[in-house]
From Swiss-Prot:
Coiled-coil annotated residue ranges, if any: none
GO process annotations (BP): cell division; regulation of division septum assembly
InterPro entries registered for this protein in UniProt: MinE (IPR005527), MinE_sf (IPR036707)
Domain of life (superkingdom): Bacteria
Pfam families assigned to the protein according to its UniProt record, in alphabetical order: MinE
Family: Belongs to the MinE family.
Protein function: Prevents the cell division inhibition by proteins MinC and MinD at internal division sites while permitting inhibition at polar sites. This ensures cell division at the proper site by restricting the formation of a division septum at the midpoint of the long axis of the cell.
Alphabetic keyword roster: Cell cycle, Cell division
Organism: Klebsiella pneumoniae subsp. pneumoniae (strain ATCC 700721 / MGH 78578)
Name used for this protein in its record: Cell division topological specificity factor
Keyword Cell cycle: yes
Keyword Cell division part of the UniProt annotation: yes
């Protein structure tokens, strides 16, 4: 019976490992598909508008799109503005 238990338990572990791997693959694909094709152009356009008013480094602008509950999309924009001459004194 120990031999039979060995083979049966091994199949169970293999199935669990395969299931976990598939869950990881599905999660990675969902995360990769979450970014729409227009996001890089949107970031560029936002950067151009900000540069009309404030001179900043392009790396100081971060645009991220987050999906929640399937129906909700959150666009997060972070801009680090340089210090002004008035605030330095």
């Amino acid at each position: 019976m120990a031999l039979l238990d060995f083979f049966l338990s091994r199949k169970k572990n293999t199935a669990n490992i395969a299931k976990e791997r598939l869950q990881i693959i599905v999660a990675e694909r969902r995360r990769g598909d979450a970014e729409p094709h227009y996001l890089p152009q949107l970031r560029k356009d936002i950067l151009e508008v900000i540069c009309k008013y404030v001179q900043i480094d392009p790396e100081m602008v971060s645009v991220q799109l987050e999906q929640r509950d399937g129906d909700i999309s959150i666009l997060e924009l972070n801009v680090t503005l340089p210090e002004t001459e008035e605030s330095k004194s």
